[in-house]
Amino acid sequence: MSKKRIYEYAKEVSLKSKDIIDALKKMNIEASSHMQVIEAKEIAALDKIFKKSDTKSEVKSEQKAEAKKEEPNKEQPKKEEPKKQSDQKRPQNNNQKRNPNHRPGSHNKPGTGGPSKNKKGKGKGKQKPEPKQEVPVVKETPSKITYEEGITVGELAEKLGKDASEIVKNLFMVGIMANINQSLNQEAIELICDEYGVEAELEVVVDATDLETYFEDVDANEEDIMERPPVVTIMGHVDHGKTTLLDSIRNTRVTAGEAGGITQHIGAYQIEYNDKPITFLDTPGHAAFTTMRARGAQVTDITILVVAADDGVMPQTVEAINHAKAAEVPIIVAVNKIDKPTANPDRVMQELGEHGLYPEDWGGDTIFVQLSAIKGDGIDDLLEMIQLVTEVEELKANPKRTAIGTVIEAELDKSRGPAASLLVQDGTLEIGDSIVVGNTFGRVRAMVNDLGKRIKTAGPSLPVEITGLQDVPLAGDRFVVFKDEKKARRIGEARQQQNILAQRQESQKVSLDNLFEQMKQGEMKDLNVIIKGDVQGSVEALAASLMKIDVEGVNVRIIHTAVGAINESDVTLASASNGIIIGFNVRPDVNAKRAAEAEGVDMRLHRIIYKVIEEIESAMKGMLDPEFEEKVIGQAEVRQTINISKVGTVAGSYVTDGKITRDSQVRIIRDGIVVYEGQVDALKRFKDDVREVAQGYECGITIENFNDIKEGDIFEAFVMEEIKRA
């Protein structure tokens, strides 16, 4: 059997090429064009489907033809010879189905003429196929249906297995007039479903391109849920020993098998303590921490706050506390450098107490660990406390699901292309997985751990670096693995398009200028404020004054205060929290200015406290929904009415008081009673459109959607003015 093109085979079996293509697709054979060549084995498979059914249909048609031959011959004694000849010719005409010259009338006349109606045998023969055509297909009424919002009467009837006219009738009986194409609300759908004893459930349409939906809890067997390692971030002031502590933990906890391995800097690493792994994010302080939070990624389970025992709480320490509190993660305080002679741990505890971190010895709930990162003292105590907090937090994951997680770092490598460091938060990541990362996608080509070793799988809380992406993602972007490569590609491309559109229509950050519009659109009633001042007294006084502003429905939220110039870290925090920065007798540095411009953060610089209060208070009052009052601006008396086709009734009027404006609303008063209230549609003097007509002048007025104007009516013009809040 030789090869053939699809259209050739279709011609052989008297079918359309599309039917053959559909059949090939059902057999999982790729087919897209009628010109495609099909192999001998594929032809054989098609023959089984089409030639077998063709044979059956031919046999049936022959049997029917023979039956039709016999029946006329049995009842021919009274017929003349010419009739017999015509009957004998008839089967030949039946076989010529595609003859364009064949007329339906000529085919029916010999068999369906007058004589056939008078013969009982002939009548019975004709009625045999009728019952087959009239057998009604009865659909069973389902016990439960799901429906999308905006379902029509016809679609509901189809789901219920009922006739649409029956649904229309039932709706009419409950007082709802609807046609087959009309959308139904939830109440109407439930009424109809109750009538048939069917449970109705609204189907929630999920946006497949929203990666956050894949992070929501999914159904999983309890057996599949397992404990996962904690993800820890170390934060603190610049010289308090964060890097030394990280190195100390890593060097003392590297297993024998890992010793001598080349460390791969992927932004995170994992160590083992008491046979339990702990993942540390090796990020550059709280800046990256906040950047991730600004993009909506919550990756950290525990924050280690490093404070030097000889230095105490410093500005960056306070910033780190505020970042951790804003992210709502538990804090463990590591009091470092206790080996120094000038160390004073009690002073550190007292200073941290001023920021809401009280040690357990003082009746608080914050864990304090004293250690020396250089000597390695207290490291074990810190790791034990991390494991204790982990047990309390009950961190769980399902390693059997497809992987989801967050990007820690990303770069464009000259030799490998886009490379991304990922933290697997749930599921298991494998080589070859189809993955969507932020606004890009690809397949996992290679995967290495923090020691630079190539691995094939990565479970929950394990940091890895992958290659194989189309583009470089951003730190904090989410990633999701899909089983279907086509689906991953489709979602990835859709997210790229959405990102392009979002960049074009990027919304502004909140500022005092656009605050009212932001609040109206987002119904946000909180104003996040960061205060930087020249002296602590001024900062505290300003914060206290702002907190005293009493405007109903609006709250001032001080998220950070400090002494010193406005820096880049302040701008990052303001951007993440969608807040504003107030500088009192201080200026922003060069990096802060550049960052504020790039992030769209509003900075307000002042030297007088009451002006700050006045400006903030004004903005907050604008945040509330405005109140309006009516102001009457004029009256006019209708002297004459003229009806003009396509325009309506024009009222020839005389302004008796004030003025009538084109954009004003009017109240039509007749015999002291208000008969209509609406908008001025047109205002003219002679043939010219005018914006307003003053007292003592005549004009022509038409009212929007109202023509029942009579002579003697009074037009009262008014506008709605916004009331300024006290």
Curated annotation (Swiss-Prot):
Q: What is the lineage of its organism?
A: Bacteria, Bacillati, Bacillota, Bacilli, Bacillales
Protein name as catalogued: Translation initiation factor IF-2
Q: Where is this region: G2?
A: 261-265
Q: Give positions of region: Disordered.
A: 50-141
Which compartments is it annotated to reside in?
Answer: Cytoplasm
Q: Where does GTP bind?
A: 236-243, 282-286, 336-339
- Is Protein biosynthesis there in the keyword field? yes
Q: What does this protein do?
A: One of the essential components for the initiation of protein synthesis. Protects formylmethionyl-tRNA from spontaneous hydrolysis and promotes its binding to the 30S ribosomal subunits. Also involved in the hydrolysis of GTP during the formation of the 70S ribosomal complex.
Q: Which InterPro entries match?
A: EF-G-like_DII (IPR053905), IF2_II (IPR044145), IF2_N (IPR006847), P-loop_NTPase (IPR027417), Small_GTP-bd (IPR005225), T_Tr_GTP-bd_dom (IPR000795), TF_IF2_bacterial-like (IPR000178), TIF_IF2 (IPR015760)
Q: Which family does it belong to?
A: Belongs to the TRAFAC class translation factor GTPase superfamily. Classic translation factor GTPase family. IF-2 subfamily.
Q: Which UniProt keywords are present, listed alphabetically?
A: Cytoplasm, GTP-binding, Initiation factor, Nucleotide-binding, Protein biosynthesis
Sample GO molecular function, one term = GTPase activity
Domain tr-type G span(s) in chain numbering? 227-396
Q: Where is this region: G1?
A: 236-243
- Enumerate the SUPFAM superfamilies for this protein: Initiation factor IF2/eIF5b, domain 3, P-loop containing nucleoside triphosphate hydrolases, Translation proteins
Q: Which NCBIfam families match?
A: IF-2, small_GTP
Question: According to the UniProt record, where is the region G3?
Answer: 282-285
Q: Which Pfam families match?
A: EF-G_D2 (PF22042), GTP_EFTU (PF00009), IF-2 (PF11987), IF2_N (PF04760)
